[in-house]
């Protein structure tokens, strides 16, 4: 998969999309033109992103990005794309913290103009650790950096998480609480169970994912800790870097209200996902980047909060990623790019890692 073509993600006509976007922008800035249109080279297969230049003498910015809810005909990754929610989160993060987020410009909740709700934001300049091919492979800027430069990037990235969790008022994030009963962590996991049920509705279920849910219950934290604003898709592939410093934090569609460790577990495991794949293809990868022990130690230094139950939270991250990967695999089947194997667990790219986590053998004994 790491060397496979990127799965199809849309059925939209890009020229038609640009034409309709130009017409819509004309209602905000009469005479506005769209130029320099491009799609990001990597990172993200859920909401669609279109990069463009806004040409108008009164434009608030010239370099823009459009975030458009997924095309339902494209067998979307998630059942709901709440663009207004993302827009609100980004606006609030900018208002309450010094975390660098792109300036949001316009929100359109009416699906009429472009076929789905969307928002427009300022486009950040910089570079992003790639997903395809992953930054853990040779031949990209992060892999080519020095150890000191990668350490600087890691420290700055953990600083983003620390400031987000510390500076954002928890009460302002409560609108992100998942429905249901129980504390925020219980509601979060229950929502993931519901998402998994949606993914496997009418198709083969995953015994491994279900075993991972069972293992979560065995590892359930005695004290999940206070809830904060969780970025959600908290990984370096969703940050634009200026050199090795974060310039813009992107992709807030998974934002939620829950323990700090939700983001920490995701950050650690999503790097391990790429690292394990890279090692499996015979390359050393970046084994010293975002090590779990280093992340826990530095986060505690920055915030005074010692991360707890990280075996639970890294397992939960791997489980959540498995559900997403299963949906992506079934989307490839939908578009005729793949067939359903006899064992559906083979569609989970990190099957071996998740199996080891379920057994309790993935992380070395302390």
Task: Label each residue range with its predicted role.
Residues 262-303, 317-336:
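Active-site activation/catalytic loop segments of kinase-like enzymes and analogous catalytic loops
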Residues 250-255:
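Activation of the activation-loop gatekeeper triad in protein kinase-fold domains
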Residues 233:
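Conserved catalytic-loop position in the HRD/HxD motif
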Residues 230:
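Conserved catalytic-core element of eukaryotic-like protein kinases
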Residues 38-211, 219-220, 224-226:
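ATP-binding pocket architecture of kinase catalytic cores
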Residues 2-31:
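Juxta-kinase regulatory segment immediately upstream of eukaryotic protein kinase catalytic domains
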Residues 305, 309, 320-366:
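Helical subdomain adjoining the active site within ATP-dependent kinase catalytic cores
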């Amino acid at each position: 998969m790491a060397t496979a073509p990127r799965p199809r993600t849309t059925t939209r006509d890009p020229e038609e999309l640009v034409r309709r976007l130009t017409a819509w922008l004309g209602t905000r800035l009469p005479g506005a033109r769209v130029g320099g249109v491009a799609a990001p080279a990597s990172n993200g297969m859920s909401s669609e992103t279109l990069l463009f230049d806004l040409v108008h003498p009164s434009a608030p910015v010239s370099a823009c990005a459009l975030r458009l809810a997924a095309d339902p005909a494209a067998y979307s990754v998630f059942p709901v794309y709440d663009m207004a929610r993302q827009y609100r989160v980004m606006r609030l993060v900018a208002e309450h913290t010094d975390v660098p987020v792109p300036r949001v410009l316009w929100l359109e909740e009416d699906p009429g103009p472009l076929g789905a709700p969307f928002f427009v934001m300022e486009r950040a300049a910089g570079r992003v650790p790639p997903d395809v091919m992953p930054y853990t492979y040779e031949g990209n800027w992060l892999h080519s950096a020095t150890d000191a430069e990668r350490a600087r990037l890691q420290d700055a990235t953990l600083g983003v998480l620390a400031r987000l969790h510390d500076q954002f008022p928890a009460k302002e994030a409560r609108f992100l609480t998942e429905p249901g009963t129980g504390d925020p962590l219980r509601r979060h996991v229950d929502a993931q169970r519901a998402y998994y049920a949606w993914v496997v509705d009418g198709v083969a279920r995953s015994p491994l994912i279900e075993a991972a849910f069972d293992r979560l219950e065995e590892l359930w934290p005695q004290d999940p800790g206070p809830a904060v604003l969780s970025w959600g898709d908290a990984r370096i592939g969703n940050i634009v870097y200026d050199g090795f410093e974060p310039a813009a934090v992107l992709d807030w569609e998974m934002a939620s209200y829950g323990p700090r460790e939700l983001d920490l577990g995701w950050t650690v495991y999503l790097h391990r996902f790429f690292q394990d794949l890279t090692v499996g293809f015979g390359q050393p990868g970046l084994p010293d980047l975002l090590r779990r022990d280093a992340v826990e130690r530095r986060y505690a230094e920055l915030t005074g909060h010692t991360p707890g139950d990280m075996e639970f939270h890294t397992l939960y991250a791997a489980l959540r990623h498995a559900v997403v990967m299963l949906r992506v695999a079934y989307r490839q089947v939908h578009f005729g790019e793949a067939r359903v194997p006899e064992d559906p667990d083979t569609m989970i790219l990190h099957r071996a890692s998740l199996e080891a986590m379920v057994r309790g053998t993935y992380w070395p004994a302390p």
